[in-house]
């Protein structure tokens, strides 16, 4: 049985891990990298995912999609979505109130939901794990930012379903990182641990109490729209202005130039974590102008000052909510690539009176590590290390219903341990009211208009009665994934109605998921067909060139007519290869057969002559046959295969 894996589906990079031989193994991808860019690219002939997609982004900016996590489970008119669209070269459109991504693939216009793009990244992670484990992977624990709301969690679960994964559990990233930190520290007594998780696109802070394998989250806070990408944006804007000052030209209209600049900025940002200054050199950036400049760490810190400082607010909120004071926090653990920034480390350290944060876990891999441990537990692993492990997580936001006057009445308060169930009795607002509309919201504000509507449903058929008499019991049930189910019942008639908050505006239906799953299979088949075509082309090319080498190395050993016939055919094939850019696998195979039909009799005659040539030692020219045949053997199909 192939194991369940843990997947950290990140904004900018993703990572997959598995529990095996009593420990976690982080699985490297086909490029040997332990994290994979969350990028998907489309072009005229194929779809690329991961490193291959990110590597070609400057050549194909409009059809390379990234940051899907910043769109998933959101509404098109969200302020963050609108702001992000200014930075993205790919086109985001409004599809019944939800954002969708429009690209050109194989010469056709295609529209994908953020769930589909995320599912493609998940498929890549699934395939990475399958290559390593040598079997089909169908079960996974997928992580989300702790501060993701209900719609974002549900959409992430849908992405898993489209990727053909049974998502055993959605767990919070900081909680997963806490497992990575605390797994081997079971016997150290009770500890209060603060996880500070700043990644490529999201930011979470969670405070946990860890004792004897029980990980209890006390409070969580964060910003689902703050991370390394935002620091890159500040650098990009800074250099666009500098380029404008120096050259009186605005490069922001050119997607390719912007992308090249962004890649350089990301590299510069990383360098500034270990160096005080770095230079940027981009040849022919825009209108043939080379852009050479430099930036200091101090300037970078100044450009991002407000963003860096804003990371302290959730830390304070978590301390307040958990009623634990700074001095009682035993460890501060940094997670996420952006915590490598020295200024961030200093702010965290200053916040806790100069205490050094704990750096014992890998900030890029900790989340996938914890997810893999949870996957092992959920599939019944009996290893001693995972035996007594218990996760108690919390709901990040209050959830409740709208009552008269647009008031938000929370049933489940934020930071309540999940799974949880809570019921309250409500009544009608006017006499003889036949039904009630139950509107479910999440958020911390007093008025529902300032909160996020999760969904609504009607409870009808209430018998006529004066206001305040009917008793309507509303129960909220939050499962272990942090996803909400709501039930309302009229106590006098026993009539009830319930919904899983599928955010009727935001959630994909079962049919849509099935359609997307079928499409994902189709894309996979297309990807495989494209790979087979490339293989057929490469096979033909290497066969033709190996024949060419044999012909030129042994010109005097061939019959002159044979030499001319075969040379002519080989040259003809090589020149047609240059023009066959969009040929099919069958065309390449047909051409190979044609070439073999001409080559085989001539090569058989040639090897026969080499083997039986008179004079000298037995076997004719020592090594001649071998030398002539070697290229064909090593590079293409061997000549002996076809009679």
Swiss-Prot record:
Span list, region Disordered: 608-643
Record field: compositional bias (Gly residues): 609-629
Cellular component, GO annotation: nucleus
Null mutant phenotype: Sensitive to high temperature. Normal cellular melanin level. Increases SSA2 mRNA level. Mildly decreases virulence in a mouse intratracheal infection model.
Transcription listed as a keyword: yes
Entry GO MF terms: ATP binding; ATP-dependent protein folding chaperone; transcription coregulator activity
NCBIfam families assigned to the protein according to its UniProt record, in alphabetical order: PRK00290.1 (NF001413)
Function description: Transcriptional coregulator that functions together with transcription factor HSF1.
Alphabetical list of InterPro entries matching this protein: ATPase_NBD, Heat_shock_70_CS, HSP70_C_sf, HSP70_peptide-bd_sf, Hsp_70_fam
Protein name: Transcriptional coregulator SSA1
SUPFAM superfamilies: Actin-like ATPase domain, Heat shock protein 70kD (HSP70), C-terminal subdomain, Heat shock protein 70kD (HSP70), peptide-binding domain
Pfam families documented for this protein: HSP70
Main location: nucleus
Entry keyword annotation includes Amino-acid biosynthesis: no
Entry keywords, A to Z: ATP-binding, Nucleotide-binding, Nucleus, Stress response, Transcription, Transcription regulation
